[in-house]
From Swiss-Prot:
Full protein name: Large ribosomal subunit protein uL18
Function: This is one of the proteins that bind and probably mediate the attachment of the 5S RNA into the large ribosomal subunit, where it forms part of the central protuberance.
Entry-linked CDD domains: Ribosomal_L18_L5e
Gene Ontology cellular component terms for the protein in this record: cytosolic large ribosomal subunit
A Pfam family this chain is assigned to: Ribosomal_L18p
Gene that this polypeptide is encoded by: rplR
Assembly and oligomerization: Part of the 50S ribosomal subunit; part of the 5S rRNA/L5/L18/L25 subcomplex. Contacts the 23S rRNA. Contacts protein L27 and the 5S rRNA.
UniProt-listed InterPro entries: Ribosomal_uL18_bac-type, Ribosomal_uL18_bac/euk
Keywords, ordered alphabetically: Ribonucleoprotein, Ribosomal protein, RNA-binding, rRNA-binding
HAMAP family: Ribosomal_uL18_B
Similarity field: Belongs to the universal ribosomal protein uL18 family.
Length: 114
């Protein structure tokens, strides 16, 4: 069960991302982290459509942090094919640390701007 702190953090993050994406008109890079895998997708909230996605389930398993970085690079490559350069990073309720940070850094190296 989620604690009150986790719920408040999640709501605070959702509110901030919602206002940021609406104000800037940028697409949203959303991250979901499970115990085994990490998933990332670029979403156009105005149309409710996923434009590019990548996950560690399709990649070779190994070190989780290295796999997260590979997902970030794969997502950046998929975004570059579709001409996407600027996004808003939506880490959800996850702290910007470890696998989430590795994915973000690799996506930046791949050419995404956030």
């Amino acid at each position: 069960m989620a604690t009150a702190t986790t719920i408040r953090r999640k709501l605070r993050t959702r509110r901030k991302v919602r206002t940021t994406t609406a104000a800037s008109g940028r697409l949203r890079l959303s991250v979901y982290r499970s115990s085994k895998h990490i998933y990332a997708q670029i979403i156009d909230d105005s149309r409710g459509q996923t434009l590019a996605a990548a996950s560690s389930a399709a990649l070779k398993s190994g070190n989780k942090t290295d796999t997260a970085a590979a997902v970030g690079k794969a997502l950046a490559a998929a975004a570059a094919e579709k001409g996407i350069k600027q996004v808003v990073f939506d880490r959800g309720s996850y702290k910007y640390h470890g696998r989430v940070k590795a994915l973000a850094d690799a996506a930046r190296e791949g050419g995404l701007d956030f």
